[in-house]
Amino acid sequence: MFSSKTEYDRGVNTFSPEGRIFQIEYAIEAIKLGSTSLGIQTPDAVIIAAEKRVPSTLVDPSSVNKILEIDHHIGTVLSGMVADARILVDHARVEAQNHRFTYDEPMSVESCALATCDLSVQFGESGGRKKLMSRPFGVSLLIAGVDENGPQLWQTDPSGTYTRYDAQAIGGGAEAAQTVFSERYHRNMTVEEAENLTVQILRQVMEEKLTKTSVEIAIVPVSTGRLQIYDQEQIQRIIDRQAEEN
C-alpha cells in the first residue's frame, strides 16, 4: 500500500484515497506550460490556430509545426509536449486510413477523437507487460474537421476524455482566451469574424509580437471538406484586417 502522497505521485495505475491519479493531474498542468492554441466552430467552417514559438534564431521555423493534418478532412492543433503529440497524431492517421480502407468512407471527426483517446489511456504497467508509455501523455489536442454532421471541434486531454466545443482554447493563455470567447463568440459567426477573433485572442495572450511568422492558422470549410493550412500571406491579410477592425 502507498503510505504518502509522494508515493501516490509515482503510481500511475493507483487511485489515492481521495480518488485522484496525481500523474494525470500533473500531465494536465504540463499542458498549461505550452503555447496557446485555439479553435472556433462556425456554420460554414471550423478554424484552428496556434502560437508558434521558435526557441532560437538558429532553428528553422518551418520545422516547428503546431497544426498537423490527420486526414484530408481533419486537422489538429496541440499544446503541451510535442513528442507526445506526434505519437497520438501518428496513431490517429493510421486509424483514419484503416477506416477509409475498410469502410470506403472517411472517418468521422468524433471517431478520430475517440481513437486518439483510446491510446491516451494506454500508459503504465499491468500484468507484467509494459505499455506504450510509462506515464500519461502530456499533451492536449483540438481536433477539427468536417463530416456528414457538419463542422466539428473536439478536445482531448491526458485522462482520455474527449469533449465537443463550439470554441475552445488550450495552453498557457487558455484562461484569458476563454474569457474573450465567452464575451465575443456566437454560433452564427461568419468565417471572417472567426478569423478576426482568432487573431484578436492570440494578439492578447502572446508574449511576443503577433506576426505572420509567429502564428499558424488553418481552416476546414464545409464547401470543400478539406483541411487548408494558411500561408504567411493569408495570415498577414487576416492580421491587417483585424487591426483595421479595431
Curated annotation (Swiss-Prot):
GO terms for cellular component: cytosol; nucleus; proteasome core complex, alpha-subunit complex. Its main location: cytoplasm. It is found in: Cytoplasm; Nucleus. This is Proteasome subunit alpha type-5. Keywords: Cytoplasm, Nucleus, Proteasome. InterPro entries: Ntn_hydrolases_N, Proteasome_alpha, Proteasome_alpha-type, Proteasome_alpha_type_5, Proteasome_asu_N, Proteasome_sua/b. PROSITE patterns: PROTEASOME_ALPHA_1, PROTEASOME_ALPHA_2. The proteasome is a multicatalytic proteinase complex which is characterized by its ability to cleave peptides with Arg, Phe, Tyr, Leu, and Glu adjacent to the leaving group at neutral or slightly basic pH. The proteasome has an ATP-dependent proteolytic activity. One of its GO terms (biological process) is ubiquitin-dependent protein catabolic process. Belongs to the peptidase T1A family. CDD domains: proteasome_alpha_type_5. The 26S proteasome consists of a 20S proteasome core and two 19S regulatory subunits. The 20S proteasome core is composed of 28 subunits that are arranged in four stacked rings, resulting in a barrel-shaped structure. The two end rings are each formed by seven alpha subunits, and the two central rings are each formed by seven beta subunits. The catalytic chamber with the active sites is on the inside of the barrel.
